[in-house]
A protein has these predicted regions:
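Forkhead-associated
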Residues: 54-55, 60-128
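Surface-exposed beta-loop interaction hotspot
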Residues: 134-201
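Extended, aromatic/histidine-rich regions of cofactor-dependent oxidoreductases associated
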Residues: 166-169, 239-243, 251, 255, ...
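Flexible, glycine-rich surface segments
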Residues: 179-241, 246
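Bacterial N-terminal signal peptides that target proteins for export
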Residues: 1-13
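Bacterial N-terminal signal peptides
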Residues: 10-22
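N-terminal pre-domain segments of enzymes
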Residues: 27-59
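An exposed acidic His-Trp-rich patch
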Residues: 111-125, 217-268
Length: 310
């Protein structure tokens, strides 16, 4: 799913910023500085070459050959001047995808032209970093979602990236920087997550966070994205969703709880990539994470972005 930390916020710096949060009484100035640093890192990540604003296409593969290029006669058509009319063919055989470029298509792998006489086996993002091909400003690679394989395209000159307006937020408020109780599940639970395309996956939930706000307790299930992660991931919706904030909910990444205590800073709640781009496959909050509470903190709806709801 499209909730990998490395592409949401940008690897080690993002983790460092979360692991030293200003939470629960450390002072307004410290909270302000922590959140502003986090916001800067988020904007830098979004506008980077691998940021969500570069996404320009997503094509699901059928078994066998899938011709790819900029002219209408191809199975996969991307109308872009950086792509040859007939760029090549993606071949799906079982769970393996290969690519055979057309002669003189100018397709590069690791900066070198790909041999048009031999297919190149492509690793998907399911096992980590996918094999990335290039054509001019375009980058394309294989993704796997719920057992389906597709080709994702990035355009380094995508107008969404070049015309990025910046992000807007609720005012920073210490009220939303909280210490929560972490309720561990023994054993960890599998929770069903549906993405924006209707695909289903089972994610691992090691436990829930329970926090107090407005005179009552609230509970959110967390997700462990990969074994050994230093963070937990939360998908949530609230009473601002579809109004001030993105209709399909928001995300929150928190440091791994210690001694049953979780640090939640909703001032660092952020939009899924689907709020910024039509070509992401964002997970939706599970029903138990949709709260009748106005979380007036974190990122607001992106002006000019796609709009989705449950």
């Amino acid at each position: 799913m499209d909730h990998c930390l490395s592409v949401r916020l940008g690897a080690a710096l993002a983790i460092a910023l979360m692991l030293v949060p200003a939470v629960a009484g450390t002072g307004a100035a410290a909270e302000q500085a922590s959140v502003l640093a986090w916001r800067q890192n988020r904007s830098s990540s979004l506008t980077s070459d691998s940021g969500w604003l570069t996404l320009a296409g997503l094509f699901w593969l059928k078994d066998g050959d899938n011709s790819f290029g900029s002219e209408p006669g191809n199975d996969l058509v991307l109308d872009n001047a950086s792509l040859a009319p007939k760029a090549g063919t993606f071949t799906l055989s079982g769970s393996q995808v290969s690519f055979t470029p057309a002669a003189d298509a100018g397709i590069l792998l690791n900066g070198r032209a790909v041999d048009s006489t031999a297919p190149v086996k492509l690793a998907s993002d399911a096992g980590g970093e996918p094999t990335e091909l290039a054509s001019g400003a375009l980058r394309f690679f294989v993704i796997e979602r719920s057992g389906r394989l597709g080709v994702r395209v990035r355009d380094l000159k995508n107008p969404r990236r070049l015309q990025f307006r910046g992000l807007t937020y609720f005012p920073i408020d210490n009220k939303w920087a909280l210490r929560a109780r972490f309720v561990a599940y023994q054993p960890a639970r599998r929770i069903k997550i549906i993405n924006i395309l209707g695909m289903e996956e089972d994610d691992v939930s090691p436990g829930a966070v329970v926090f107090s706000q407005n005179g009552r307790e609230w509970r959110l299930d967390t997700v462990l994205e990969s074994p050994g992660d230093e963070t937990l991931f939360i998908m949530f919706a609230d009473a601002t969703s579809g109004h001030e904030t993105y209709g399909a909910g928001r995300f929150l990444t928190i440091p791994m709880p210690v001694d049953g205590v979780a640090l939640l800073d909703f001032n660092k709640a952020y939009n899924p990539p689907c709020a910024l781009n039509d070509f992401a496959t964002c997970p939706l909050p599970p029903p138990q994470n949709r709260l009748p509470l106005r979380v007036e903190a974190g990122e607001l709806k992106y002006s000019g972005g796609p709009e989705h709801s449950f």
